[in-house]
């Protein structure tokens, strides 16, 4: 299960985040085969 942050202004899609680690950065790591919302 991956919690999601609500979309922020200027951000069309929510980014997954992990507790204690802040926003997940798909440009650094994308551990599962899903479309990359950062692109």
From Swiss-Prot:
Region annotation (Disordered) ranges: 1-39
GO biological process, one term: defense response to bacterium
GO cellular component, one term: extracellular region
Compartments where found: Secreted
Assigned keywords, A-Z: Antibiotic, Antimicrobial, Immunity, Innate immunity, Secreted
Induction pattern: By bacterial infection.
InterPro entries listed in its UniProt record: Abaecin_antimicrobial_peptide (IPR012524)
Main localization of the protein described in the UniProt heading: secreted
Role description: Antibacterial peptide against Gram-positive and Gram-negative bacteria.
Listed name of the protein: Abaecin
Organism: Bombus pascuorum (Common carder bumblebee)
